[in-house]
Amino acid sequence: VIEVVYLRTPFSAGNATT
């Protein structure tokens, strides 16, 4: 569900690439 987290937090978008 890391993709959802990145959608909520633009800062986490960098980690969403995993």
From Swiss-Prot:
Its main location: virion. The keyword Lipid biosynthesis does not apply. The modification Phosphotyrosine is found at Y6. Signal peptide: none annotated. It is found in: Virion; Host nucleus. One of its GO terms (cellular component) is host cell nucleus. Gene3D superfamilies: Hexon Major Viral Coat Protein, domain 3 (3.90.249.10). Keywords: Capsid protein, Cytoplasmic inwards viral transport, Host nucleus, Host-virus interaction, Late protein, Microtubular inwards viral transport, Phosphoprotein, T=25 icosahedral capsid protein, Virion, Virus entry into host cell. Major capsid protein that self-associates to form 240 hexon trimers, each in the shape of a hexagon, building most of the pseudo T=25 capsid. Assembled into trimeric units with the help of the chaperone shutoff protein. Transported by pre-protein VI to the nucleus where it associates with other structural proteins to form an empty capsid. Might be involved, through its interaction with host dyneins, in the intracellular microtubule-dependent transport of incoming viral capsid to the nucleus. All late proteins expressed from the major late promoter are produced by alternative splicing and alternative polyadenylation of the same gene giving rise to non-overlapping ORFs. A leader sequence is present in the N-terminus of all these mRNAs and is recognized by the viral shutoff protein to provide expression although conventional translation via ribosome scanning from the cap has been shut off in the host cell. This is Hexon protein. It comes from Canine adenovirus serotype 1 (strain Utrecht).
